Regions:
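A glycine-centered beta->alpha junction motif in the catalytic cores
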Residues: 48-61, 102-113, 196, 238-257
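ATP/Mg2+ or Mg2+-diphosphate-binding catalytic cores
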Residues: 242-288
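ATP-dependent phospho-/nucleotidyl transfer catalytic cores
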Residues: 7-8, 87-157, 213
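Active-site acidic catalytic loop and adjacent metal/ATP-binding pocket
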Residues: 30, 136-190
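Active-site activation/catalytic loop segments of kinase-like enzymes and analogous catalytic loops
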Residues: 190-223, 236-255
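ATP-binding pocket architecture of kinase catalytic cores
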Residues: 1-86
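Helix N-cap / loop-to-helix initiation motif
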Residues: 26, 224-228
């Protein structure tokens, strides 16, 4: 595939992939060329990379077996993914909250002229209230200690761990492969678990039973600390998907809004009460 990034970061990624591969996690590691480089060039000087690939199918979000197998794979992945630093995300939440207010002001000043804008104005106060509550929860947790520990241990996240990047290997009943590590970063590792669970649970209308199964499967392999448990609650409390839709609208010149994004916003509004209840119920009791 074409490559446009930093070769230095790519070497770090390869180091990570090979460590995982050597410890029994199938990855799409890079293949070196005759010059022992990970990046090659064609006649037009276009840079590209070659990666090991697998015969298999993506994680089926309709299959609980695939979902739970993916969670177990993520737990094993996190045990092995250690390198070095993390970024503060409290400031990110505060910035996102300010952006939600800015978009609200922009639409009010110009007048809501389409379905997306009308839905946004009708719902933004409730989602903003939830966003501010998430910041308050974060301030009440041991987030600084959690960040310091993640920094000290060099915890690494996949960055885009979702159903498209977990393959169920053909002919291997137990095997999985994890692909597309291009967004790896230093972070608190339950960020990966949050992202995977959120994408699945949106499809299951925030089903508490399924969420409990996913958390238990992960916890059995890589125990979730009490601080990480609180951090997961904060992440599920913050309306990240709502902010993403609003930010996409605002940063793309507000000229045309796709039907798909209107549907996504309407679905978030419909699910709001179930989603709010989910964060309270799911993380009420720390697993024993």
């Amino acid at each position: 595939r074409e490559f446009h990034g930093s070769e230095k970061k790519l070497e770090k990624q390869q180091e990570l992939l090979m460590r995982l591969q050597e410890n029994g996690i199938n990855t799409d590691y890079f293949l070196r060329n005759n010059q022992e480089s990970l990046v090659s060039k064609d006649k037009t000087e276009q840079r590209f990379t070659l990666q090991h690939w697998y015969e298999g199918k993506e994680c089926d979000t309709k299959s609980r077996e695939d979902i739970l197998k993916s969670v177990r794979t993520l737990a094993r992945l996190h045990i092995l993914m250690k390198m070095e630093p993390v970024e503060e995300y409290r400031e990110e939440y505060l910035r996102h909250n300010q952006e939600l207010r800015k978009i609200r002001k922009f639409i009010r000043n110009k007048g809501a002229s389409n379905v997306f804008e009308k839905n946004y104005l009708a719902s933004v106060e409730q989602f903003l209230e939830r966003a501010q509550y998430a910041v308050k929860l974060l301030d009440e947790t041991d987030y600084d200690d959690l960040r310091e520990r993640a920094w000290r241990e060099g915890q690494v996240c996949h960055g885009e761990y979702n159903q498209h990047n977990v393959l169920m290997l053909k002919g291997d009943h137990l095997g999985t492969a994890v692909t597309n590590f291009g967004h790896w970063s230093f972070d608190i590792q339950v960020a990966d678990l949050y992202r995977f669970m959120r994408k699945i649970l949106e499809k299951y209308n925030w089903n508490l039973e399924l969420a409990g199964e996913m958390l238990r499967e992960y916890h059995k392999i890589r125990p979730i600390s009490a601080e990480e448990w609180k951090n997961l609650r904060v992440r599920f409390t913050y309306p990240e998907k709502y902010w993403k839709l609003a930010n996409y609208y605002y940063s793309h010149k507000k000229v045309w809004i796709s039907e798909k994004n209107v549907e996504k916003l309407q679905n978030l509004i419909r699910q709001r009460e179930i989603w709010e209840n989910f964060a309270e119920e799911c993380f009420r009791d720390y697993p024993q």
